Amino acid sequence: MSTNHRPQLESKRGKVIKIKDTIQHARGLPQQTSIKYRQDIKNEKTINKFDDLQKHDNNKITSLESISPPTKKLKIESTKEITTEPLNQEIDKQSKLSLKNDDQSDIQPNEKSESDEEDSKDEEDDESSDDDDSDDDDTALLLKEIENIRREKEKQNSDSTNNSINNSLTLQTHDSSTKKKSWRSSTTFNNKSKKESTNDRNNNYTTDTLNSQHHQKFMSKYIR
């Protein structure tokens, strides 16, 4: 990357510059014009700054507290009319009603309990007989299913053994009859080379020009 877009520093231009530019580089400017005091050591300036900040925060809090949320108008409900009857009469009426209800509730459960017990006994007897019959049927069905599963497993095992025997026999016959040919025999270049080799024995063809038949004939005819 090039840095031609950046202004050149004075250290590269030299000490004496005849034409001064208005451009000032950030590195040439003063970096810090004010003194920074340590905050962990208490000085007059740091204490005054802290007090000012604390006062400012307190003023904000008080201003926020002074602002009250908008109040809703409450509707005043009309007062109910006060009854003139004394409280003692009402209490007596309630106690009498409760006693009557208790007496009726004690009589009715006793009659119901006897009838419920008889009905429950009859229902239990019927349910027990039905459960026994259903259990017998379930056991018979389970035994049948178990027998069917066993038969299926035996068939699968016999089929697998037969298949393995047949496969082994077929492999033996294939090995004895024919052997696998290599992939090289099916290639075109291999077949061509064999054909050419048989022809070369008869023609004595060579790529060497000195040992070729044509060259030897030429030499014997015109030179020797």
From Swiss-Prot:
Residue ranges with Acidic residues bias? 114-139
Q: Name one Pfam family in it.
A: Cwf_Cwc_15
Localization? Nucleus
UniProt biased composition (Polar residues): 60-69
Bias (Basic residues) occurs at: 214-224
GO CC field = catalytic step 2 spliceosome; nucleus
Q: What does this protein do?
A: Involved in pre-mRNA splicing.
Subunit (UniProt): Associated with the spliceosome.
- The name under which this protein is listed is Pre-mRNA-splicing factor CWC15
Organism (species):
Candida albicans (strain SC5314 / ATCC MYA-2876) (Yeast)
